[in-house]
Amino acid sequence: MPLNLSRNQIIIVSAIFGVVLFLVLVFLGVIPGLKEQNSGGFFGQGEQIVLSFWGVENNDFLMPFFENYQKIRPNVRVDYKQINENDYEKTLINALAAGRGPDIMMFRGNWLPKHADKIIPASENQITFSRFQELFPTVAVSDFAPERKIYALPLFVDTLTFLYNKNIFDAKSVALPPKNWNDFQNLVPRFNEIGPGPNRQVIKSAAAIGGSEKSVHAAGDLLNVIMLQFGSQLIGQKNRQINFGEPEEKAFDFYLQFANPAGQRYTWSDNLPYSLNAFAEGQTAAIFDYAAQIPLLKKKNPFLEIGVSFLPQLNPEKPVNFADYWGLAVSEGSKNAAYGWDFIVYSLADQKTAEKYLEVSKRPPALRTLIQKFANDPDLGVFARQALTARSWPQPDNNKVKQIFSNMIESVLTAKLSRREALQKAENELNELY
């Protein structure tokens, strides 16, 4: 007996049939994109995907990301390749140029001006600019999303701090580390041991400061942050040019005083052992360095009692700190860019997943929620709190910038150039990079 359906009934039956067919196709994996996350995520689970990931981090530290991501994306496997940090950039760039680069890469915080053309930004569907601002500190926003396009997410945020030898401080009856540069200057004579004669050889140093990269690890970063504390912008906001003026001159003079044998604050020489070695061996009471160096220092001297304090400030009411860190980005040539960004956002924007990484890596946090949680942590608290006031500036080539600043310092210490001449030479060389 034929069915006599009205026009409205036919429309309803057709709609029901269409919905049922659509759900069947989704279930079979023919139509990806709308599955529940616990059955493979919005990318589906039918297609097997392998994401290649290159970086400098220890594979064991990254395992929480891989394990947690596979729980929601069982069809995706992440293959990680660890590369020595000294070789990483060259190896990565050569591979990308040859079309053999990874889908996901570790990307340094100051790389964007140099390597922006090699990575693909996230889409609005993956993470919005406003969400990025909510999640991460200002320094990451300025480094990774300068024009509201998000090129990378920070894995951690390390900052330059004051690392001191607790035993030496106790022996000199110094109960607390300096809070500002004035306090630091006053402490210098208490730790100094200077030899007799006109050469004034440094036997024991208060801190590794005033030298070039030849003897001081992160010397360029230390001079950079002192310039920023003195009010330097380091680069013009309109013309993107370096213009060293009064703030930079004052900061440079301040820095160099600690390596001037004729000065009252003389405490360092480029002829001394490298700062990390000098600190590990007790030849200097303090260094200005990052959390990343602490395991190395303890390896050099397992009995070293390291105190961690905030970087001294010119104006403690308006602290300015300096960051050095890595993020994760997706290669411009990746065939799995959507999956790559899905992995990055899930791993780094999720508090529970990011915290598991911190627990094994001991890296300072990048998420604001974790910065708040770790603010009073005995190991990471100083680094976490400084991340909120960390600054940076767009460097066209971080390696060349580092060398230019080091040469500038050394040229004055060796009396090859005056301070003004050295600044002018460095200014010209920096502007040639843009």
Give the positions of each predicted feature.
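Extracytoplasmic "Venus flytrap"/periplasmic binding protein-like
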Residues: N68, I72-F136, N167-K179, A278, ...
